[in-house]
Amino acid sequence: MYIQVLGSAAGGGFPQWNCNCVNCKGYRDGTLKATARTQSSIALSDDGVHWILCNASPDIRAQLQAFAPMQPARALRDTGINAIVLLDSQIDHTTGLLSLREGCPHQVWCTDMVHQDLTTGFPLFNMLSHWNGGLQWNRIELEGSFVIDACPNLKFTPFPLRSAAPPYSPHRFDPHPGDNLGLMVEDTRTGGKLFYAPGLGQVDEKLLAMMHGADCLLVDGTLWEDDEMQRRGVGTRTGREMGHLAQNGPGGMLEVLDGFPRQRKVLIHINNTNPILDEDSPERAEVLRRGVEVAFDGMSIAL
C-alpha cells in the first residue's frame, strides 16, 4: 500500500492566511525553522497508479500539482484520482470537491450522516450534479468493510469517532455515529495495515485494540496543549471541545502512542498554533524522542 500525505495541517493550513500567532508570524519573518503545510488530505493506492483520495481539502489543486502521479497524462483530460472517501463533512475536508468539478463524475464514499450534511447544510452533491454527473454517492456502512474497485487489494474498515458535526450542519448539537470516521486500511497482498484518524478526540479500549493491529498509526496531531488556542490568544475552545486529543500531559496522544513500540507513529492535521511545527522547539524534540514523526506535505509511506 502506498500512502501519500498531500496535506498535513489542520484547517487554515500553516501559516494560516489571517494569523499572526508566534508560529505564523515567525514563519513569515524567517525567524522560525518550520515548513509550510496545506490542509490535511492523504491519497492511497495499491499499485502507485490508481489513487483513492481521503478528504478533499481547499488546497487540493496545489496538492495534486505537487504529486506527479495525480496527473498520469494518458489522455487530454486525465487524473490519478479514481475515488474519494470523506471521513466527515467539515469545510476543510470537503471544499476541495468544488475544485474537482471538471473531472466529474466522481465516485464519493461517505456515511449517511455526511451525505445528509452535503445535501442540506452544505449541498455539494446538489450543486455539482450540474457537472457531468457530479458526485456519485457510495454509502459507507458503520459495520463491516468495503473495497473500492479501483484499488481491489485495499480493504477499508471504517470506525465511528466521537466528534461534533460542522457548525453549518442541521444536527450540529445532535451528534450521531457516522458524523466522523477513522479508517483501518489493509493491503490484502502485503498484510500492511494503516490506522488513520486525523480527528481523534478520545481513545477507548476498542480503538486501542484496533491500533495494536496496525503497522502505521497516522493520527490526530492538532494541538500540543488542550487549551492551546486560549494560550495563544486565537480562540476560546479547548481541543476536547473540538474533538481533538492534545499531545501533551497525562492521557494525551503521546502517552497513548507510548503503548505502541512496534508501530510507525505519525502525527497529522497539525494546527498552526502547535509548537511542534517549530523544528527547534523542545516540544518537537520531545515528540521525536518518543519515536513519533511529524507528517509533512509530500511524505510517502509504504506498507
Curated annotation (Swiss-Prot):
Keyword match Methyltransferase: no
Keyword Transport: yes
Entry keyword set: PQQ biosynthesis, Transport
GO biological process assignments: pyrroloquinoline quinone biosynthetic process
One Pfam family linked to the record: Lactamase_B_2
Residue ranges of the TM segments: none
Pathway: Cofactor biosynthesis; pyrroloquinoline quinone biosynthesis
Function: May be involved in the transport of PQQ or its precursor to the periplasm.
Family: Belongs to the PqqB family.
Protein name per UniProt: Coenzyme PQQ synthesis protein B
Organism: Pseudomonas putida (strain ATCC 700007 / DSM 6899 / JCM 31910 / BCRC 17059 / LMG 24140 / F1)
